[in-house]
Structures are given as structure tokens and as C-alpha cells.
């Protein structure tokens, strides 16, 4: 059966998400995937440069010293930190930890995740530099 009534279609502007801060932050957080793609491509390029020998590796290192590449890598670092912060704030909402018949607040878990991140980063950096 078909109807003769015209369906109501609510108009929505293309910039609807810019009206509320929550949606702007959501778009910013989701936009952190673009620098992650850049870093993934950069790592793949580095692996192939390493595979091609010393000359290829020297070319890769000189590519990394380009000011534009340095800027993109710093931007990627900030994007990764923002993404990490939002995921660490989300983790306590996904897990209910009960200690002495009381639900634990989110702060200890968030702090523990940051401590693990800093310790793991320090270990990786120490191994890379030694």
C-alpha cells in the first residue's frame, strides 16, 4: 500500500556539528585518525628504506629532517596524546571495578593507564638509545 502524503524531511545544514562544543570535540577526536594514517605510512616508508640498505636509510633520515615532516610529526604526537587521553577517560566507563563493596572511581584507573604508558615509553626510549 502506498501513501499520497509527502514525507517530512527535516533539513540539516552541513555544519550542524559546529553548533555544540561536544560535537566539535567529537569531530576533533575522530580527526586524529588522519595523523595516525600519516604516521603509519611514514613507518612503512621507513621499513622499506631500511630494507633497501644504507643509502635508502640515509634518504629516509634526511626526509625526516625536512621541516614540514617535523611539523607533521609533532602534530601527530599531539593528536595521539589527545586520542590517548580520551580513550583513557573512556576505559573506566567500560569496566566496573568493585573494591570492598564499593565501585571504584575513574581517577585511579586513568592514572594507572598513564603510568603504564609513561613507563612503557621510557623503556622503549631507553632500549632505542642504548
Swiss-Prot record:
Localization, per the record, is:
Cell inner membrane
For this record, the Gene Ontology CC terms, alphabetical, are: fumarate reductase complex; plasma membrane
Task: Extract the Pfam families matched here.
Answer: Fumarate_red_C
Transmembrane regions listed in the UniProt entry: 30-50, 60-80, 110-130
Lineage: superkingdom: Bacteria
Tell me the membrane topology, using the record's own terms: Multi-pass membrane protein
Chief location bin:
membrane
What GO molecular function terms would the record report? succinate dehydrogenase activity
Query: What are the UniProt keywords, alphabetically?
Result: Cell inner membrane, Cell membrane, Membrane, Transmembrane, Transmembrane helix
Q: Outline the subunit composition.
A: Part of an enzyme complex containing four subunits: a flavoprotein (FrdA), an iron-sulfur protein (FrdB), and two hydrophobic anchor proteins (FrdC and FrdD).
Family that this chain belongs to: Belongs to the FrdC family.
NCBIfam families assigned to the protein according to its UniProt record, in alphabetical order: PRK04987.1
Query: What is the annotated role of this protein in its UniProt record?
Result: Two distinct, membrane-bound, FAD-containing enzymes are responsible for the catalysis of fumarate and succinate interconversion; fumarate reductase is used in anaerobic growth, and succinate dehydrogenase is used in aerobic growth. Anchors the catalytic components of the fumarate reductase complex to the cell inner membrane, binds quinones.
| Protein name in UniProt | Fumarate reductase subunit C
- Name the gene that codes for it: frdC
Amino acid at each position: 500500500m502506498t501513501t499520497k502524503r509527502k514525507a517530512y524531511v527535516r533539513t540539516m545544514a552541513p555544519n550542524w556539528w559546529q553548533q555544540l562544543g561536544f560535537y566539535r570535540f567529537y569531530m576533533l577526536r575522530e580527526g586524529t585518525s588522519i595523523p595516525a594514517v600519516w604516521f603509519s605510512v611514514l613507518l612503512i616508508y621507513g621499513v622499506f628504506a631500511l630494507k633497501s640498505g644504507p643509502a635508502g636509510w640515509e634518504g629516509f633520515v634526511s626526509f625526516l629532517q625536512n621541516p614540514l615532516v617535523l611539523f607533521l610529526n609533532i602534530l601527530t604526537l599531539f593528536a595521539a596524546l589527545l586520542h590517548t587521553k580520551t580513550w583513557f577517560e573512556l576505559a573506566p566507563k567500560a569496566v566496573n571495578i568493585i573494591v570492598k563493596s564499593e565501585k571504584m572511581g575513574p581517577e585511579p584507573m586513568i592514572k594507572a593507564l598513564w603510568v603504564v604508558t609513561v613507563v612503557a615509553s621510557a623503556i622503549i626510549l631507553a632500549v632505542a638509545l642504548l
